[in-house]
Each structure stands twice: as structure tokens, then as C-alpha cells.
Amino acid sequence: MSTPARKRLMRDFKRLQQDPPAGISGAPQDNNIMLWNAVIFGPDDTPWDGGTFKLSLQFSEDYPNKPPTVRFVSRMFHPNIYADGSICLDILQNQWSPIYDVAAILTSIQSLLCDPNPNSPANSEAARMFSESKREYNRRVREVVEQSWTAD
């Protein structure tokens, strides 16, 4: 059955394959267009450099009118990422707009890695460290990056 959400996701997938943003990949899981796996590579020349971070995106039939549920599957240490991998990002909540596609969502999350918002912490320890001890914060991020190489 082809619904508006499924048609839109097929378009998003085609666009992502034809013109992938740097450091991002994503595709539907098996034969389910409503459930995607994605990978964000840590941006160059940042503490996240070299990391490979896996995410899952769950879409509803209300997409693109409602945002997907996005979670990091990889372990993360970041002010705006909860312990369960869910992400505190305005475009995934109150600032969502149907103009955002999968590429825009993943690009925004990649940007968030390097530009956290410590005023809206999902991980208070990471937010405190980011604000008070950038060196220690960067060390913890590097640990997460190294773990991303061996995680399955």
C-alpha cells in the first residue's frame, strides 16, 4: 500500500542516494520504508573526527507532518543526547516542519555534535563538562569515538 508518508520516504531515500550530504548515510531497514538505519561520521577537525555513529529513525504515517523518532544506537556522550540515545533537538520537536527531509534531519544532528546547546541539557554531566572543562569533555568524546570503531 502506498501512502503519502511512504511516497515521501521513497523520495527522501532517492534524494539521499543521488546527492548524499558529506559524512551521512541512511537507508530503510530491510523491506520497511518506515524504519531506517543511518550513520553519521564525526566531522573532521573536531573531537568527533573519525567516529562512526549509528542511528535509527522510526517514521509514522503522519510523516512529513510529524517528525520521526530518532535515536542514536551508538553510545554517546553529548549535552543534548539522552542515555537512551534520544536527541534533544528543536527540529525533532517544536520546530519541526514538513520541509525537512531525512538528509536535513541527519545533517542537523551532525551539526549538533559539534555545536551543542548546554542550556537545554539531556545529559547534565556532559553539559556541565562542556561548559566548565572543555578539555575533559573532549577527552570523553574521544573515548566514545574510539568505542564507535569496535561497536557492532
Curated annotation (Swiss-Prot):
Pfam families: UQ_con (PF00179)
SUPFAM superfamilies hit by this protein: UBC-like
Name used for this protein in its record: Ubiquitin-conjugating enzyme E2 2
Induction: Not induced by heat shock.
Coiled coil spans: none
Keyword terms: ATP-binding, Nucleotide-binding, Transferase, Ubl conjugation pathway
Keyword ATP-binding included in the entry's annotation: yes
Family indicated by similarity: Belongs to the ubiquitin-conjugating enzyme family.
Domain UBC core: start-end pairs: 4-150
Entries under SMART domains matching the protein: UBCc (SM00212)
Expression (tissue specificity): Expressed in all tissues examined. Lower levels found in leaves.
Molecular function GO terms recorded: ATP binding; ubiquitin conjugating enzyme activity; ubiquitin-protein transferase activity
Catalysed reactions, semicolon-separated: S-ubiquitinyl-[E1 ubiquitin-activating enzyme]-L-cysteine + [E2 ubiquitin-conjugating enzyme]-L-cysteine = [E1 ubiquitin-activating enzyme]-L-cysteine + S-ubiquitinyl-[E2 ubiquitin-conjugating enzyme]-L-cysteine
Function: Accepts the ubiquitin from the E1 complex and catalyzes its covalent attachment to other proteins.
Enzyme class at the top of the EC tree: transferase
GO aspect biological process, one term: ubiquitin-dependent protein catabolic process
Active site: C88
EC code: 2.3.2.23
InterPro entries reported for this sequence: Ub_conjugating_enzyme (IPR050113), UBQ-conjugat_E2_core (IPR000608), UBQ-conjugating_AS (IPR023313), UBQ-conjugating_enzyme/RWD (IPR016135)
Pathway where this protein functions: Protein modification; protein ubiquitination
Alphabetized PROSITE patterns for the sequence: UBC_1 (PS00183), UBC_2 (PS50127)
